[in-house]
From Swiss-Prot:
PROSITE patterns: SAICAR_SYNTHETASE_1, SAICAR_SYNTHETASE_2. It is an enzyme of class 6 (ligase). SUPFAM superfamilies: SAICAR synthase-like. Its EC number is 6.3.2.6. This is Phosphoribosylaminoimidazole-succinocarboxamide synthase. One of its GO terms (biological process) is cobalamin biosynthetic process. NCBIfam families: purC. InterPro entries: SAICAR_synt/ADE2_N, SAICAR_synt_PurC, SAICAR_synth, SAICAR_synthetase, SAICAR_synthetase_CS. Pathway: Purine metabolism; IMP biosynthesis via de novo pathway; 5-amino-1-(5-phospho-D-ribosyl)imidazole-4-carboxamide from 5-amino-1-(5-phospho-D-ribosyl)imidazole-4-carboxylate: step 1/2. It comes from Alteromonas mediterranea (strain DSM 17117 / CIP 110805 / LMG 28347 / Deep ecotype). GO terms for cellular component: cytosol. It holds the Pfam family SAICAR_synt.
Amino acid sequence: MEKRDELYRGKAKTVYYTDDSDKLILHFRNDTSAFDGEKIEQLDRKGEVNNKFNHFIMTKLEEAGVATQVEALISDTESLVKKLDMIPVECVVRNLSAGSLVRRLGVEEGQALNPPIFEFFLKNDALHDPMVNDYHILSFGWATQEQIAEMKALTFKVNNVLKALFDDAGMLLVDYKLEFGVDKDGNIVLGDEFTPDGCRLWDKETRKKMDKDRFRQGLGSVVETYIEVAERLGLSL
């Protein structure tokens, strides 16, 4: 597979065209950002850790019947992925209260949420990813009603799979975001990534934060903690 021109450069990943029009290369960089890019640092090995972690999780989801974009690891920091027409919203599920939910609603951090809360956010850094709902998505043509329903169903399916996976490894899946796209056949497919950059994970016993909040809050040992998460899941890095 031949890497060609850069298609898109995000805060922590770069996407490249390939010589196959249906395939892209997803490159995980060491860049680490928070607060819509206001805080940025380079963390050694982070690109490698996130690339391999993402491949591990996406493989678990494929085994559970969730179609994903990831095809193969092709280097320590790169994966071959299917080309998708990405839907410009994030699907967020919250199992415990944390982050922006606590700030918005004034609730206590760590409150169990039953049922889990589902939220949509528009992917727009300039607007700080505002919350939107089904009506916004339909009115602005970002997705159809059928696609909205499919994204919700898949997001909750992912929740069932990954809550159990992390629970068995002594961790709580507090919340996470997913992004979906449409493949060449019109199917909704899970894209982007699932890494500790895009979810919150706490140790079940101590409530130690094991995700990008370590970077946001200056807790240190970011990559070391990501590696600990991976190793608890049985992924040797």
